[in-house]
Amino acid sequence: MVTTRKPERFISYFVIITISFLLITGCSKTYYSAMEKVGIHKRDILVDRVENARDAQADAQEQFKNALEQFGSVITVENTDLKDAYEKLNAEYKGSNEAAKEVSRRIEKVESVADDLFAEWENELGLYKNKALQDASARNLIDTQKRYDEMLASMHRVEKSMDPVLRTFRDNVLFLKHNLNAQAIGSLRSEFSGLKVKIEVLVKNMNDAITNSNQFIEDLNQ
């Protein structure tokens, strides 16, 4: 099952309601303005959204592992109830698909606030009167963008790695649905090793992305 994501961790209940309304109506400038009034800036929002994207990937990782385990149990148990097997695998496929969608949604939220943060940062470089401070801030911006791009690239690798797993899973669930016989189980057995490899690649990419996210969060909090 996909874990319900937490709200941005440091926002009061009242602020959550207000901000949720602003998000729904698409008023990003008003949203940021309201957040800043309670001491929460784009940098803070970015950290929180990266944490949520990281957690969504961790949840998805567990879901895909569970799906593989369920897949394996279906093909190894003798005299498997085919209808029951279909129901179990279909449930795991749906859970995995929702987990993948949640990861993508969280990544989009990260990209949205990051784009706004970096645009604001770059625009405000022109406000400096002290050249040394301006240069230091510009270097910090470039460095932060570079580390962000590396982290985001690892997140997108996760997205790409989920697609072939979901396609393989969906194809086999559909085949089982319309062929509730021994031939269907034989087909699942032939697909298992390939699915396992794809999920192993996915898990590795997720671990890399989670590590990169943690490092990026640590760097921003310094």
Residue locations for each model-derived region?
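Bacterial N-terminal signal peptides that target proteins for export
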Residues: V2-V15
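C-terminal motif of bacterial Sec signal peptides marking the signal peptidase cleavage site
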Residues: L23-G26
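Charge-rich amphipathic alpha-helical interaction elements
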Residues: S28-K29, R105, S193-Q222
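Amphipathic alpha-helical coiled-coil segments
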Residues: K94-R106, D143-S161, K198-I210
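Extended amphipathic alpha-helical interaction segments
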Residues: R106-E191
